[in-house]
Amino acid sequence: MASQEMFPELGQSPAPGVKSRGVSRSPHPHQQQQQQQHQQHQGQFTGTVTGLDLDSSIATASSFANSSFDPNSNNVSPSAESYGYTAAGYLSGTPASQTDQNYANSLQIPQSYGTGLVPQFNESRGLPIQQQSQQQHHQQPSLDDNFSDLLNSNATEYDFNTVYQTHSPSSNTAPEYDSSLLLDPQVHQQSHPTQIPSSHSSTSPQISPLEQQQHSSPGPMSTQGSTTVAYYTPQHSRHASLDPATAAFLTSNTHPDWQAVMGNSAAFQGHRRAPSEVSEISSAAPSPYLSQHESFDGVDNNPSPLLAPQNDPSLYDSALGIENFTLSEQHQQHQGFSPAHSPYISPRLMPQQGQEMMPNVPYLSGPAPNTQYPTPPNDMYGNGAEGMMNMSQGTHPSVDIGQASQMAPPSINVEFAPPSRIPSFGPSKPASNLDSLSPPPSSTRSRGRSKSDPYAHPSTSRLRSSSTSSSLDPLAPTTPRSLSPFDSFGRQQQSNPSSRDPSPSRSNRRLSTSSIDSRNYILGLADPQRPGASPNDSKRVQKHPATFQCNLCPKRFTRAYNLRSHLRTHTDERPFVCTVCGKAFARQHDRKRHEGLHSGEKKFVCQGELSRGGQWGCGRRFARADALGRHFRSEAGRICIKPLLDEESQERERSLMDQQQHHLQPLPQQVMVPVDNPHAGNFVLPAALLAQYPALQTLQWDQIAASADDPSDIGGRSSFDASSGNEFGFEDDDSGLSSVSGINAGYSAAGNFY
């Protein structure tokens, strides 16, 4: 405030040809180099306006208000020495070669700028102050008029102690910022708002217009002639926002932790100005020390037209160890700074644990050296040094900077166990024949087979007798597991459900209650080696074999009565005549059936009751059984008996589940009448229908045409042959008729049906 009261006119803008330059490290031409020399000692010596030379009258005057400052004498008072300058080296006519050499070395003038400016600068420094002032007036005649009214002619009114009473090293008040955080040699400098220059270059006559265009400020609002525009500059030092030492990287010499920086540094206590393009002291302005300036416009974006960005060797020289970082070196110890120093959790740092939190797992890490008990070896099979997992042995490493990123990934080595010399998992398996298709022995199986499995019965039969234990041999010719078709006799003795032996299902085998039992049952029926599948099986052996052969045709019959009725068909003998119409028939059964038509009685009705309730059929009535059979073979008749077929299928599945739950044997074949003739289309009548109309069991389906019945068959000859049905017996292809019932063998005449 004292400087503002003494120089009230300093707030005005300078002449159009001159712009006030602030604290800049840019080596300008002759005029700006002298400005920077004065500004270097500004915070320690004087408060004159930037860019002004001392007048000769002021330089020779001896009546200063401050008696410690005498420019003509070499004696410096103690107060002047405390400011760090000597009058002989600064204001005397003697060339200050040492000062020039130090200042010239501190500036790195790039080769792109004219080197002819340096001799001009050095030659002018060797002249006395008065000659320099005259030379300055000859070179720039307009500058004397611009700055002549800025200095007071009375030299006694300059009170330098009053101006710099708060920034001297001997002052009682501390500066606004910590001097240890600054890299600039001007440690105690305070920038006045009128002394801070704008970002535009000055129009010096010693700079060519081409250089002015090249090194102009990159600001979007800057023009070469706009020097009268006044810019707003806030009242704080540029070191608080541009000093690299106040960045987030700590050094080992300043503060040990983040709390000291955040608590003691004044740069983090105040408000920072937002980035601006027109402010010189904005935090967005790049620093000349910052070589990592992210700009895609080249070096023309630098704030100084004559100084390229350069590194600060004290801070940015291999600060983070990026220059020495390689991906191939996994165990490299980085000497830079890490976010681990920060009290805040970094999202880029992997979680780490100390030694006291890590469990002592033998397969994951090495045991601690001071364990109370010996650690068991990692080698499970006694192979030596190699275990199941090849991990590093040793103590847990302490938590270090970047320790999580330096850990090598664990490697897993899979080693197969050596072959066991001692059988530890039960008896060894017998050598099986690879050519056989038999299942494995039941001794190694944990669960038994289902009841419909044909292999389940022989596996349990060896428990009852020692003589059948040899059946486990897969090469035995009489084994039930053999695929030979000639071992059915041995199968009957072991797996016949009708044998005298105890039921194999009552043994100590666990039964399966799977939901696909019907599938196993169907597969068992399709097995040609299943019990009862062979015609030589005791269950399927006919009690009356077809031993009566016809000498005129290949038909065979079980009874002599049936053979005689058949021979009448060849001789066309019809001894049985109808009493109503006189129609003759070869069989007694055919005449009785024909006489029923004359009476009008139709006792064959397509209707019946279901076991679960309800009725089936269409209700049509037929006088003959063959007419009802033809009806069932038609499309309408198939729809009529479909409820019976569905009910029978459900009953079969229910009975199969009951067998498995109650350890019962498989049921015998369902009472059906399968038709083996290919012309019949495998027509099968339900068992309930056959039980309701037993006459349907004796029908010769191969001789019944699949057409509508003809009720006018009274006078004509019957379409049947002379046999009554019972006399034909069982042929080779009619073996399915034997499973209907046993009533057919008891009839000696056809009249017993009625």
Curated annotation (Swiss-Prot):
InterPro entries: Snail/Krueppel_Znf (IPR050527), Znf_C2H2_sf (IPR036236), Znf_C2H2_type (IPR013087). Residues 30-44, 130-140, 189-209, 459-472, 491-515 have a biased composition (Low complexity). The keyword NADP does not apply. Transmembrane segments: none annotated. Disruption phenotype: Leads to reduced levels of beta-1,3-glucan in the cell wall and impairs pathogenicity in an experimental murine model of invasive pulmonary aspergillosis. Increases sensitivity to heat shock. This is C2H2 finger domain transcription factor crzA. It is found in: Nucleus; Cytoplasm. PROSITE patterns: ZINC_FINGER_C2H2_1 (PS00028), ZINC_FINGER_C2H2_2 (PS50157). Its main location: nucleus. Pfam families: zf-C2H2 (PF00096).
